[in-house]
Amino acid sequence: MAGAVPQFMVDEYVLAYHGPLLYEARVILAEVWDESNTLLGTVGPHYFIHYKGWKQTWDEWVPESRLLKLNEAGFAKRRALLDAQAKKGRSTGGSGGTGSPGAGKGGLKDKKKDTKKRGRDAMESESDFMKRPEVKIVIPDVLKLVLVDDWENVTKNNQLVALPRKPNVRELLEEYRQYASASKKQERSDRATALLSEIISGITLYFDKALGNNLLYRFERAQYVEQKRQNPEKPMSEIYGAEHLLRLFVNFGPFIAYTNIDTESLNILRDYINDIMQWMIKEQKRLFMKEYEETTTHYQNLSRS
């Protein structure tokens, strides 16, 4: 369907309406339907989702209107719906009826237990999310200027980062790992030194997972789709470079909120990211593209369709 741009991506965690409430779910498939291929009678972006903690028999296709981003605003909406549902339950007295023939009281009780359990799970999940430590990554002023130029080149000048980049994300992070191992800063703890390789691998994995969902401007999506088509087995960390890695660091705080990581490891991770950015400043002329690639009129029209 022309002009339809999916707001959610495969493997993204979301909040999904099921009945009157919102539940955590994961996007398994994403498709844009039109009148010729719709399965539900609706057109536009649709998603096949799996509800967290539910059996696969509940997996289903839903339109985009059934989904919300998994963030504080989404949790606020879910909390409001839970409160409204609780008030509604109190107002009806909870005595219920005799149920449908053959259902029996046991069936009704089981249904109520199931609903209550899902409600508790939702509240516990939200509570856990709100308790997770926040990671604040401070971007150095020098790199903020790089980000501004990057944004203007892509969104204002209709230019692109030429791909594949050299060095790519995987290569430059390996360069940093070797640099950090050789420097062995005295203030770095033994645990921090031991975690270096694991953290580099983790950042690379985050990049591969986040790029398509969170790190691209709309104008870059057609280029991304083409790269995926040409390199179906190649991770994006072997195609994209410093420009997009820097965008990851800008968004790293919210990403970490969705992981189970202890405070000490969190601080070590933050310190390494800060150190990586300082190293990137030293290597700025080599790592960042000086001139972006001009695009054709055809590409510009394609990216806006």
From Swiss-Prot:
* Residue spans crossing the bilayer: none
Coiled-coil-forming residues are: none
The entry's localization annotation reads: Nucleus
Indicate the segments forming the MRG domain, all copies. 131-304
Q: Where is this region: Disordered?
A: 86-127
**Primary location group:** nucleus
Checking PANTHER family in the record gives: MORTALITY FACTOR 4-LIKE PROTEIN, MSL COMPLEX SUBUNIT 3
What is this protein for, i.e. what is its function? Involved in deacetylation of histones, chromatin assembly and chromosome segregation. May act as a transcriptional oscillator, directing histone deacetylases to specific chromosomal domains. Component of the NuA4 histone acetyltransferase complex which is involved in transcriptional activation of selected genes principally by acetylation of nucleosomal histone H4 and H2A. The NuA4 complex is also involved in DNA repair.
Subunit notes for this chain? Component of the NuA4 histone acetyltransferase complex.
Q: Which family does it belong to?
A: Belongs to the MRG family.
Protein name, per record: Chromatin modification-related protein EAF3
Natural source organism: Cryptococcus neoformans var. neoformans serotype D (strain JEC21 / ATCC MYA-565) (Filobasidiella neoformans)
As recorded in Swiss-Prot or TrEMBL, the protein's gene is named EAF3
